[in-house]
C-alpha cells in the first residue's frame, strides 16, 4: 500500500481549522424558478396574441382586451422581485450580485418588451386605448420597484407608445417613453412617516424644434434627441383644493437633467442612468424635493 505524501498530513490541521467551505447554489439552480415563471408569463402573453390573431369570435377578443389590465397586474409581483433583487441597496447576493443583477435585469427587459408588444398589438386592432387622458386606457404599465436608500424608493413605468409630455402638448414636440416615481419618506415628529413623490421621465424631443423650425419646413429626416428630466410643477398650489378640482391636468415643465443622444436607451440602461443622476446629484439620503431647481440643474452631456 502506498503511503500518503507527508505534505497531506501537514495540510489537514489547516483544513480542519477553516472548516468546510460553504456550499454555493449554482447560478443555474438559482435562476431556475425565475426562468420558469418567465416562461409561464410569456406563454400567457402568447395565448393572448394567438386568440387575437386567429380567433374569429370578436366577443372573445373584446373579453380578452378587458382582461389585459388584469394580466399586467398579474406580472407586477414578478417585476417587483426582479428589480428589487437586482437593484436594491444593500445588495443581497454578495459577491455574485453583479452576475445575478445582469441576469435579472435581462429577464425584466425581456418581459417588459413582450408586454409592450402585446398591448400595441391589441391597440392596433382597436381593442385597447393608449390615450393617457382616458382613465380606462393602458397608456403605461408598472415594471418594478426598488430602493436606493432606506428612505428612497423608485417605481418604474413604461409607456406602450410615446406620449405627449402633457395633454396640452407643452413643452412642444416633447414625448415621454418611461416614468419613474421617486418616493421619499421622512420621519415626522408626531404623525409618523410622511412621504413625497417626485416624477422623472425618459423623453425625446424632435430635433427641428431645437433648430427653431416647424414641422412644415423641417427636413424629412427628423431625429429624436433622448434625455432624462424631472417634472417641474407649475401649479396649482398643493393646499389649494378648489383649484385642483377644477384643473383638468396640472401644468408642468420639463427640467432636463441628462442628454443621452439620438439612440433610444434600453429599458435597463435608462433606469441605470436615472439611478446615477439621483445618487450623483442629491445623494441617497437627501430628498430631491428639499432642493430647489438650481440644486438639481445639471449641464447636458
Swiss-Prot record:
Name the InterPro entries on file. DUF3314 (IPR021748)
A UniProt-annotated Pfam family = DUF3314
What family, per the record? Belongs to the UPF0575 family.
**GO BP terms, alphabetized:** in utero embryonic development
**Which protein is depicted?**
UPF0575 protein C19orf67 homolog
Amino acid at each position: 500500500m502506498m503511503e500518503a505524501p507527508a505534505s497531506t498530513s501537514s495540510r489537514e490541521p489547516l483544513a480542519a481549522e477553516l472548516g468546510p467551505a460553504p456550499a454555493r447554489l449554482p447560478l443555474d439552480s438559482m435562476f431556475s424558478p425565475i426562468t420558469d415563471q418567465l416562461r409561464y408569463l410569456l406563454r400567457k402573453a402568447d395565448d393572448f396574441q394567438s386568440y387575437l390573431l386567429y380567433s374569429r369570435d370578436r366577443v372573445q377578443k373584446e373579453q380578452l382586451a378587458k382582461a389585459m389590465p388584469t394580466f399586467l397586474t398579474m406580472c407586477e409581483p414578478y417585476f417587483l422581485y426582479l428589480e428589487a433583487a437586482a437593484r436594491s441597496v444593500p445588495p443581497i447576493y454578495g459577491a455574485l450580485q453583479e452576475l445575478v443583477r445582469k441576469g435579472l435585469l435581462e429577464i425584466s427587459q425581456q418581459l417588459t418588451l413582450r408586454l409592450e408588444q402585446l398591448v400595441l398589438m391589441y391597440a392596433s386592432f382597436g381593442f385597447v386605448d393608449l390615450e393617457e387622458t382616458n382613465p380606462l386606457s393602458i397608456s403605461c404599465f408598472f415594471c418594478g420597484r426598488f430602493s436606493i436608500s432606506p428612505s428612497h424608493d423608485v417605481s418604474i413605468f413604461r409607456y406602450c407608445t410615446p406620449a405627449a409630455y402633457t395633454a396640452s402638448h407643452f413643452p412642444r414636440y416633447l414625448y415621454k417613453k418611461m416614468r419613474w416615481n421617486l418616493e421619499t419618506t421622512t420621519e415626522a415628529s408626531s404623525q409618523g412617516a410622511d412621504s413625497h413623490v417626485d416624477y422623472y421621465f425618459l423623453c425625446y424631443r424632435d430635433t427641428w424644434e431645437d433648430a427653431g423650425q416647424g414641422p412644415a419646413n423641417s427636413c424629412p429626416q427628423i431625429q429624436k434627441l433622448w434625455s432624462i428630466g424631472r417634472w417641474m410643477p407649475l401649479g396649482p398650489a398643493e393646499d389649494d383644493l378648489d383649484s385642483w378640482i377644477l384643473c383638468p391636468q396640472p401644468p408642468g415643465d420639463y427640467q432636463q437633467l441628462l442628454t443621452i443622444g439620438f439612440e433610444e436607451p434600453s429599458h435597463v440602461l435608462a433606469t441605470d442612468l436615472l439611478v446615477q443622476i439621483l445618487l450623483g446629484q442629491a445623494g441617497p439620503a437627501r430628498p430631491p424635493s428639499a432642493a430647489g431647481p438650481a440644486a438639481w440643474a445639471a449641464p447636458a452631456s
